Amino acid sequence: MKSIYRSLGKIHVCYSAPLHTSVEDHWVSATFASPTNKPITERQPTMIDREIELQTKDGAMNTFVTHPEEEGPHPVILLLMDAPGKREELHDMARRLGTAGYYVMLPNLYYRRVREFKIQESSREVMHEHMASLSNAMICEDIQSLIDFADEESAARDGKMGCVGYCMSGPFAFAAAAKFSDRIAASASFHGVYLYSDKEDSPHLDAEMITGEMYFGCAETDEYAPKKMVDGLENYLRGTNLNSRIEWYPDTEHGFVFPKRGDKYHKKSAERHWERLFAMYRRCL
């Protein structure tokens, strides 16, 4: 396993206990497990799920929101969808973050073109058209709308927030960390594409603006995020003061974190991805 650290100070990596969740309608009960795998029954948070219509200058952005019912306000985390779109699989991932004590927002980034996108019912060409319609600047405008909404929510805590992107949204999470450096204190990209490129808006160009922590989780075999791209990013970041980490996940392919990705799913690595996220958010938020 190859792990590369770039930090202004020492990073202490901690491991989160697994969460076991059961979902029924819009209410979630969670039982936490201790490092010894003995249930901790003292705290079983009730989760609130809802869909909101968040108004932006380009229209209504349907967004899934989940957070614990009590003990708020909670730090905000923005979970940015991958190319197949906002779906129940991602809702469950948002819930897993939320049960740890976060206010999680999952927006439909394709809202300018379609309210719901289901890859099973559409061709990959349509998906690629949706992807090509987006830009880092557009997504940052959407994130500003998400921040504005969260700032008015009593269950959402003001101040430092987190972000995570997958696949196509990896560069969005990278760009957002720079654009909103006063708010985003911890951001992560998993099997992110175009993190380092010759595009005019390549997110690596603004890396020096990031004041928070940045994590990049990379699949060992990834035709969409090849080693050459990641190596270029690594070399570039060596010349910056960005508090960052690039970590390779052995024996994995693009999409390894998603349980419904068939044989691409790699459970051990997917759990490590959760450990890295929870540890970073605990450190920074």
What is the meaning of each model-derived region?
Residues 5, 9-12, 21-26, 32, ...:
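N-terminal cap/leader regions of alpha/beta-hydrolase-fold enzymes
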